[in-house]
């Protein structure tokens, strides 16, 4: 099973960026230990990126991510509640719109976005929830609290 692992990982705050990147790496490790094929967008390397304008680079990243979501069987999103960025939310919406199952892993006690939760197939709490989730049977768990719709 192919998994696209979404999550916000680029912030002005360098420490927050490092923390989120480490959590995404750990989630990728947990998923790979389950025998899943994981794509982690933060690992994308565009050769000679400095040769491109920001707009050209952005389009290449966007196009590559769309291709990888299309190839995935499921999208797993690490969610930091209100700290989620537009890119991660867009990835969830795109995956939902193309009929992919979306698993949201809540990493805070914050209330989750109603749009993220209603677009998810299943929700689990924390890395332990991700580690315990059975991707063979794909249970429809609802462990997170969302905004009032």
Give residue ranges: language-model regions.
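Conserved catalytic or regulatory cores that recognize and/or transform ribose-phosphate-containing ligands
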Residues: 1-149
């Amino acid at each position: 099973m192919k998994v696209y692992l979404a999550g916000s990982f680029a912030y002005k705050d360098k420490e927050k960026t490092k923390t989120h990147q480490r959590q995404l790496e750990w989630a990728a490790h947990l998923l790979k230990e389950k025998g899943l094929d994981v794509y982690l967008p933060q690992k994308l390397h565009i050769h000679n990126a400095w040769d491109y304008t920001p707009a050209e680079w952005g389009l290449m990243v966007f196009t590559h991510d769309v291709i990888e979501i299309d190839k995935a069987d499921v999208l797993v999103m690490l969610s930091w509640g209100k700290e989620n960025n537009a890119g991660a939310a867009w990835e969830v919406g795109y995956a939902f719109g193309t009929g992919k199952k979306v698993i949201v892993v809540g990493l805070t006690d914050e209330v989750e976005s109603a749009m993220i939760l209603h677009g998810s197939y299943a929700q689990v709490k924390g890395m332990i929830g991700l580690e315990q989730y059975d991707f063979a049977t794909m249970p429809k768990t609802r462990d997170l609290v969302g905004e009032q719709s």
